[in-house]
Amino acid sequence: MPDINESMLNQFRPVIRRFIDPIADRIALPADYITLTGFLVACAASAGYASGSLITGAALLAASGFIDVLDGAVARRRFRPTAFGGFLDSTLDRLSDGIIIIGITAGGFTGLLTGLLALHSGLMVSYVRARAESLGIECAVGIAERAERIIIILAGSLAGYLIHPWFMDAAIIVLAALGYFTMIQRMIYVWQRLK
């Protein structure tokens, strides 16, 4: 039985690594440069959404997500991972997450309140983990981590493009709800570890 505290995609990580690692082995570019590239592509995705194009935003978001997976593999296999590299990756991931939601909201695909709730829930998911880790507790738990959140946005984008733009709004509502649920999961996990 799967652990409710475990990321939905965690079971696929070995499969993803088998696909990504051979690509990472061919890349000589330092991981930090790849991280920065991924962030710039996320900014372009946000601009695509803001301009009213679900398909452009989604294509660039998918590319950014792929680059994000790739930078970790490059750091792990081609270069020695560094503390700053991990810090940079995490910081730019948070910026990317926020700017994507801003682009979707600016493009009119979701309401202002829904967009703000999605931003807030994403912020709290990250904050709870950072605060837990400052207490010495590894807190990479929860049903909807970053990869799951990106997939939800991509699914909403595709359905919104092919069927009706309302699906993008629905995806952001789901994103906000799962963000708060993940935050609560992490709070309970930390409470159990500290009691």
From Swiss-Prot:
Keywords (A to Z) from UniProt: Cell membrane, Lipid biosynthesis, Lipid metabolism, Magnesium, Manganese, Membrane, Metal-binding, Phospholipid metabolism, Transferase, Transmembrane, Transmembrane helix
Keyword Nuclease assigned: no
Name its pathway: Lipid metabolism; phospholipid metabolism
Q: Catalyzes what?
A: CDP-2,3-bis-O-(phytanyl)-sn-glycerol + 1D-myo-inositol 3-phosphate = saturated 1-archaetidyl-1D-myo-inositol 3-phosphate + CMP + H(+)
Q: Active-site residues?
A: D93 (proton acceptor)
The UniProt entry lists membrane topology as:
Multi-pass membrane protein
Please list the residues that bind Mg(2+) 1: D68, D71, D89
Protein family? Belongs to the CDP-alcohol phosphatidyltransferase class-I family.
Q: Which HAMAP family match?
A: AIP_synthase
Q: What is this protein called?
A: Archaetidylinositol phosphate synthase
Its lineage opens with:
Archaea, Methanobacteriati, Methanobacteriota, Methanomada group, Methanobacteria
